[in-house]
Amino acid sequence: NLRGAMSDYDLALDIDPNNFIGHYNRGLLRARVGDDNRAIEDFDFVIQMEPDNMMAIFNRALLRAQTGDYRGAIKDYTTVIDQYPNFLAGYYHRAEARKKIGDKKGAEQDDFKLLKAQLDKQNGGTNKDVAQNQNKDKENQNGENGDESEEGKTRKKSDKNMNNYRKIV
């Protein structure tokens, strides 16, 4: 019974209006029943009390986008992405909001970030792994670690060294 829960939150917040957890939960509930503008007000209160609450900021961003406030949504998505640069949902939603306001370049940058992350995931590596492999390749080409792998761009079929699997047979 969502309406009953809503009246319970209203009553609880009448008793303790500064309870930001109550505002957060009521904001989620209001969003669930489609009362987006009042849900945004609840998340505004939570963010005022706890400016680093990234979940409240992200939820407000989603609601702002739903109500057509794309610039406000982009600002909130950017805040979350700045704090958590690997939060891919933030890039996806920001790209969608940027498309809505005609910021093609910004949307393409976010889409590129998503594509790059998907490729890294498919290839089983992260940016850190890719950088480490590039450093190993440079070391191998410079003759360092010569025991571990052969120099150059080719490898033998019998070579079992995983660092050489990117080389031509």
Regions found by a protein language model. Give the residues of each.
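Alpha-helical tetratricopeptide repeat
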Residues: 1-169
